[in-house]
Design a protein with these regions (language model features):
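Intrinsically disordered, low-complexity terminal regions
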Residues: 1-230
Length: 230
């Protein structure tokens, strides 16, 4: 069963919807979905906020101008996109892609794989992370990887003009590359610099623990900080 709802000039709100496909689309207005489920859920607005709360299914939420807010999502994948606005997620387990051209990307209560990007704004994330790509062209990138996080693939955190900060669980092993063009390095974990490694005030390449997958922390202009938490 497919449930499509469309508005050219007005808000859309729906709840308690159950269908294979759920589609809410507004050309100029907010789009809100709550307490609903579907195999695939698409929420789109050209000019307005998009929100989903207590929703189950593969989610695509997109607005050209407005915020995207998602709370308590249950599904395998989520793609959240804003042209001009914030992207906020609280509560999700799966594969996440969240991006905005101008605004903040903030994720918490998360478990899984995430790719986060803001062209002009900050990136924040907290959760149990397996794979991570986080970037801001002009803003800070700050990630707290909670206990239970693993490196199933390389992690990369980067900023063009801003600070980069990563907190990882104590005891996590990885290869480290940390570098800044104009700023300082603050690495609060023991790093072994083997033959072929590198260390100076703006670049550090080495091994943490037993090594393994790579964590890369880079900024063109800003500070880089790496620390641990219980």
């Amino acid at each position: 069963k497919r449930v499509p709802l469309h508005s050219s000039y007005g808000d859309l709100a729906a709840q308690h919807v159950e269908a294979d496909e759920v589609q809410l689309d507004s050309s100029s207005g907010t789009v809100r979905l709550a307490d609903s489920s579907g195999k695939r859920i698409e929420l789109r607005s050209s000019y307005g906020d998009v929100s989903a709360r207590h929703v189950a299914g593969e989610l695509v939420a997109k607005t050209s101008s407005g915020d995207v807010k998602v709370e308590d999502l249950r599904g395998a994948t989520a793609t959240l996109t804003s042209g001009y606005g914030d992207v906020l997620l609280d509560g999700f387990q799966g594969d996440l892609s969240a991006s905005t051209s101008s605004g903040t990307v903030a994720v918490k209560g998360f478990t899984g794989t995430c790719e986060l990007k803001s062209s002009y704004g900050d990136v924040r994330a907290e959760g149990r992370i397996d794979r991570l790509q986080a970037r801001s062209n002009s803003g800070s990138v700050r990630v707290r990887a909670l206990s239970g996080s693993t490196l199933e693939g390389d992690w990369k955190l980067a900023s063009g003009y801003g600070d980069v900060e990563l907190m990882v669980p104590a005891g996590l092993s990885f290869e480290l590359v940390a570098k800044t063009g104009y700023g300082s390095l603050d690495v609060q974990v023991p790093v072994t610099v083997p033959a072929g490694g590198f260390k100076n005030e703006r670049k550090l390449e080495g091994r943490v623990g037993d090594g393994g997958k790579r964590i890369e922390l880079t900024t063109s202009s800003g500070n880089v900080r790496l620390g641990t938490q219980p």
